[in-house]
Structures are given as C-alpha cells and as structure tokens.
Amino acid sequence: VSSYYTMREDLLHSLAANEVNFAVDPFPPSETDIKKEIIFEDEFVCGFRKDHPLASSKNLSIDQYLELDHIHISGRRTGGALVDNALSKLQVERRVILRAQHYLITPELLNNSDMVLTCTKAFAKKHKLAFKTLPFEVAPSQFFLAWHESNDNDPGHIWLKSLIKESFQEAKLK
C-alpha cells in the first residue's frame, strides 16, 4: 500500500488508469465512472488553547472572530478555504497571519500563542483544544472516498476500501 499526493487535475486519469486505487478528497471528480461516498463529515469550529482569552467568553461574535490571528491550512500556495468562501459572502475577511500545509503542526502553535484555527470539532477534541461555535454559517467539512467503477468487484479493493472507511470513522470518534 502506498499513499501520496496527486494533483486534482490528474486524479481522473490516475483513477481510470489504475495508477491510483482511491482518492480521499473534499472535491472528488464528478464523472459517472467515478464512484464516491462520504467517509467523514464534521462541523467547523474555532479552536484555541484552553487558557486563551476566548475560553472565558460565552459566545464568539463575528467581529471577535475577524479580529483574531488565524492559522490557515492549505496544500495550495494561494486561495481560501470553505470558511473563507463563507466569509466572502458576508463581504468580510479573517486575518490570516500564518499559512501552513498541514494541520499536524497547529496544536503546538496554538498551545503557545493566541492564534486560532478554524478546524473540525473532531480535530479540536482530539488535540484537547478549547473551541467555540463559528458565528456564521459554513458548510461542514466533508471528505469523500473516490474510486474507479472498474474496481467495484475486486476483493482487495473492497477490503482496502473498508479499512479506509473504518479508519476515518475511528478518527472522528477519538
């Protein structure tokens, strides 16, 4: 088993050519020969260290949220996230002071600063972060498992698909 990053624009070809057996992505290809199912869904929250000044407030207002120092996670050099798209509909912008490629660096950063991270509730709980409900509507975080239909009856493919789905369910429960 190998796991690696594939550019979205190459994903359809890679799945069809069996160069890639599965893709885990929030935006899977929508072609009819690509099967997909949701394997993770969770609400976004504003996460921060337990003794952060926000920890004692009852709710988080949109003005408070926008004034905070945010960490933005993205594998891309530019562009926003679902949260930024929701904020742009309100014609506002959050203050991003750090952009990183992966969530795993954030617990240490958050626990040693006043920065905040918009993340899933599961991530906040797993890393023992305090969190508040976001003060605006945003679609939930979703990850899909996608594969080419030609693999539907392959026993190894079926087995690996069940392991991937199970690991995502366990990750959400922890």
Give the residues covered by each predicted segment:
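Short loop/turn segments at beta->alpha junctions
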Residues: M7, S61, Q101-H102, T120
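Secondary-structure junction motif
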Residues: L54-A55, L68-L90, N153-K161, A171
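Short alpha-helix C-terminal cap/hinge motif
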Residues: V1-Y4, L12-E19, N85-K89, S162, ...
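Beta-alpha-beta core module
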Residues: T32-I38, D42-E43, L104-D152
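Short hydrophobic/charged patches on amphipathic alpha-helices used for structural packing
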Residues: E9-L12, A16, K36, I62, ...
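Central regulatory/effector-binding core of bacterial HTH transcription factors
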Residues: V1-E31, R99-A100
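Alpha-to-beta junction loops
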Residues: L15-V24, F44, V92, L110-L117
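Flexible hinge/capping segments at coil-to-helix
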Residues: E31-H70, D154-I158
